[in-house]
Protein backbone atom coordinates (compact mmCIF):
# COMPACT_ATOMS: atom_id res chain seq x y z
CA UNK A 1 0.00 0.00 0.00
CA UNK A 2 1.10 3.59 -0.51
CA UNK A 3 2.42 5.29 2.63
CA UNK A 4 -0.66 7.51 2.91
CA UNK A 5 -2.88 4.40 3.09
CA UNK A 6 -0.75 2.32 5.45
CA UNK A 7 -1.05 2.31 9.21
CA UNK A 8 1.38 4.66 10.97
CA UNK A 9 2.97 2.23 13.42
CA UNK A 10 2.73 -1.19 15.03
CA UNK A 11 1.86 -1.46 18.72
CA UNK A 12 3.16 -4.56 20.52
CA UNK A 13 1.29 -5.54 23.69
CA UNK A 14 2.00 -9.27 23.86
CA UNK A 15 3.63 -11.44 26.56
CA UNK A 16 7.35 -10.70 26.93
CA UNK A 17 8.66 -13.56 24.78
CA UNK A 18 6.62 -12.28 21.85
CA UNK A 19 7.93 -8.70 21.67
CA UNK A 20 10.88 -9.19 19.32
CA UNK A 21 9.33 -11.27 16.47
CA UNK A 22 6.60 -8.74 15.56
CA UNK A 23 8.98 -5.80 16.10
CA UNK A 24 11.45 -7.40 13.70
CA UNK A 25 8.73 -8.01 11.12
CA UNK A 26 7.38 -4.46 11.41
CA UNK A 27 10.80 -2.80 11.15
CA UNK A 28 11.79 -4.97 8.17
CA UNK A 29 8.63 -3.78 6.44
CA UNK A 30 9.13 -0.09 7.18
CA UNK A 31 6.78 0.37 10.12
CA UNK A 32 7.51 2.39 13.25
CA UNK A 33 7.13 0.35 16.46
CA UNK A 34 5.77 1.13 19.92
CA UNK A 35 6.30 -1.80 22.29
CA UNK A 36 5.57 -2.73 25.86
CA UNK A 37 8.64 -3.44 27.95
CA UNK A 38 10.87 -5.38 27.78
CA UNK A 39 12.05 -4.54 24.28
CA UNK A 40 13.46 -8.03 23.86
CA UNK A 41 13.71 -11.35 25.67
CA UNK A 42 17.51 -11.58 25.75
CA UNK A 43 20.75 -9.83 24.78
CA UNK A 44 20.96 -11.55 21.38
CA UNK A 45 17.55 -10.16 20.43
CA UNK A 46 18.47 -6.73 21.83
CA UNK A 47 21.54 -6.51 19.60
CA UNK A 48 19.52 -7.66 16.58
CA UNK A 49 16.80 -5.10 17.37
CA UNK A 50 19.35 -2.29 17.59
CA UNK A 51 20.69 -3.21 14.13
CA UNK A 52 17.19 -3.44 12.68
CA UNK A 53 16.24 -0.01 14.00
CA UNK A 54 19.37 1.59 12.54
CA UNK A 55 18.94 -0.18 9.20
CA UNK A 56 15.22 0.58 8.88
CA UNK A 57 15.52 4.22 10.01
CA UNK A 58 12.13 3.72 11.65
CA UNK A 59 11.20 5.00 15.09
CA UNK A 60 11.08 2.57 18.00
CA UNK A 61 9.46 3.49 21.30
CA UNK A 62 9.30 1.55 24.55
CA UNK A 63 6.36 2.27 26.82
CA UNK A 64 6.72 3.38 30.40
CA UNK A 65 3.08 4.28 30.90
CA UNK A 66 3.24 5.94 34.32
CA UNK A 67 5.45 8.83 33.16
CA UNK A 68 2.44 10.30 31.38
CA UNK A 69 0.34 10.67 34.53
CA UNK A 70 -0.29 14.33 35.52
CA UNK A 71 0.81 13.84 39.16
CA UNK A 72 4.04 12.18 38.02
CA UNK A 73 4.74 15.09 35.67
CA UNK A 74 4.02 17.53 38.52
CA UNK A 75 6.41 15.67 40.84
CA UNK A 76 9.11 15.80 38.16
CA UNK A 77 8.51 19.54 37.73
CA UNK A 78 8.75 20.11 41.49
CA UNK A 79 12.12 18.32 41.61
CA UNK A 80 13.43 20.08 38.50
CA UNK A 81 12.52 23.54 39.83
CA UNK A 82 14.06 22.87 43.24
CA UNK A 83 10.81 22.97 45.21
CA UNK A 84 11.85 19.82 47.07
CA UNK A 85 15.48 20.83 47.56
CA UNK A 86 18.38 18.54 46.80
CA UNK A 87 17.24 14.94 46.47
CA UNK A 88 19.05 12.83 49.08
CA UNK A 89 16.70 9.88 49.52
CA UNK A 90 14.39 8.17 47.04
CA UNK A 91 11.78 5.67 48.21
CA UNK A 92 9.74 4.05 45.47
CA UNK A 93 7.40 1.11 45.70
CA UNK A 94 4.98 -0.87 43.60
CA UNK A 95 3.06 -3.32 45.80
CA UNK A 96 0.48 -5.76 44.47
CA UNK A 97 -1.10 -8.83 45.98
CA UNK A 98 -2.63 -10.66 43.06
CA UNK A 99 0.04 -13.40 43.00
CA UNK A 100 -0.08 -14.15 46.74
CA UNK A 101 -1.24 -17.68 45.86
CA UNK A 102 -0.33 -20.04 42.99
CA UNK A 103 -2.81 -18.38 40.68
CA UNK A 104 -0.78 -19.60 37.71
CA UNK A 105 -2.03 -23.17 38.32
CA UNK A 106 -5.69 -22.13 37.93
CA UNK A 107 -5.57 -21.33 34.22
CA UNK A 108 -5.45 -17.56 34.76
CA UNK A 109 -3.67 -16.38 31.59
CA UNK A 110 -1.86 -13.32 33.00
CA UNK A 111 -0.50 -15.30 35.94
CA UNK A 112 0.40 -18.17 33.63
CA UNK A 113 2.79 -16.27 31.40
CA UNK A 114 4.07 -13.81 34.01
CA UNK A 115 5.34 -16.62 36.27
CA UNK A 116 6.79 -18.77 33.48
CA UNK A 117 10.47 -18.02 32.74
CA UNK A 118 10.04 -19.34 29.19
CA UNK A 119 7.47 -16.62 28.46
CA UNK A 120 8.24 -13.89 31.00
CA UNK A 121 12.03 -14.03 31.03
CA UNK A 122 14.57 -14.40 33.82
CA UNK A 123 12.98 -11.79 36.08
CA UNK A 124 9.55 -12.13 37.66
CA UNK A 125 8.13 -9.37 39.82
CA UNK A 126 11.22 -7.16 39.54
CA UNK A 127 11.05 -7.30 35.74
CA UNK A 128 7.28 -6.99 35.58
CA UNK A 129 6.58 -4.12 37.99
CA UNK A 130 9.94 -3.28 39.58
CA UNK A 131 10.99 -1.79 36.25
CA UNK A 132 8.08 0.67 36.51
CA UNK A 133 9.26 1.73 39.97
CA UNK A 134 12.83 2.14 38.68
CA UNK A 135 11.61 4.18 35.73
CA UNK A 136 9.59 6.48 38.00
CA UNK A 137 12.50 6.97 40.40
CA UNK A 138 14.81 8.08 37.60
CA UNK A 139 12.17 10.02 35.65
CA UNK A 140 10.93 12.07 38.59
CA UNK A 141 14.32 12.80 40.17
CA UNK A 142 16.34 13.19 36.98
CA UNK A 143 19.00 11.05 38.67
CA UNK A 144 20.44 7.82 37.28
CA UNK A 145 20.95 4.64 39.27
CA UNK A 146 24.64 3.80 39.32
CA UNK A 147 24.76 0.90 41.80
CA UNK A 148 22.30 -1.48 43.39
CA UNK A 149 22.00 -4.48 45.66
CA UNK A 150 18.90 -6.63 45.25
CA UNK A 151 17.16 -9.24 47.37
CA UNK A 152 14.70 -11.12 45.15
CA UNK A 153 12.49 -13.84 46.59
CA UNK A 154 9.86 -16.32 45.45
CA UNK A 155 7.62 -16.55 48.51
CA UNK A 156 5.02 -18.79 46.90
CA UNK A 157 6.15 -22.41 47.06
CA UNK A 158 6.95 -23.89 43.65
CA UNK A 159 7.13 -20.55 41.86
CA UNK A 160 10.07 -20.35 39.45
CA UNK A 161 10.45 -16.56 39.40
CA UNK A 162 10.67 -13.88 42.06
CA UNK A 163 7.37 -12.53 43.37
CA UNK A 164 8.90 -9.98 45.75
CA UNK A 165 11.92 -7.71 45.53
CA UNK A 166 13.77 -5.18 47.66
CA UNK A 167 16.57 -3.15 46.15
CA UNK A 168 19.04 -0.70 47.70
CA UNK A 169 19.95 2.05 45.23
CA UNK A 170 22.77 4.54 44.79
CA UNK A 171 22.16 7.39 42.38
CA UNK A 172 24.40 9.81 40.57
CA UNK A 173 24.76 12.95 42.66
CA UNK A 174 25.03 11.01 45.92
CA UNK A 175 21.37 10.24 46.61
CA UNK A 176 20.46 6.82 47.96
CA UNK A 177 17.23 4.94 47.67
CA UNK A 178 15.07 1.93 48.31
CA UNK A 179 12.91 0.23 45.71
CA UNK A 180 10.26 -2.28 46.78
CA UNK A 181 8.14 -4.25 44.35
CA UNK A 182 5.91 -7.12 45.33
CA UNK A 183 3.15 -9.20 43.82
CA UNK A 184 2.45 -11.02 47.09
CA UNK A 185 1.95 -8.02 49.43
Where are these regions (language model features)?
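Structural detector of well-ordered beta-strand residues that form the stable sheet scaffold
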Residues: 34, 59-61, 91, 149, ...
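A structured beta-alpha segment of the ubiquitous adenosine-cofactor-binding alpha/beta core
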Residues: 1-7
Amino acid sequence: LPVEERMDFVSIVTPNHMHFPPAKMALENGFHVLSDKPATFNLKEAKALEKLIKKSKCLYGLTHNYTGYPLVKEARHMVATGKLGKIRKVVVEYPQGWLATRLETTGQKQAGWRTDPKRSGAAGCIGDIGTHAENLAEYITGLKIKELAADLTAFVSGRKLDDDGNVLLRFTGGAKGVLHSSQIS
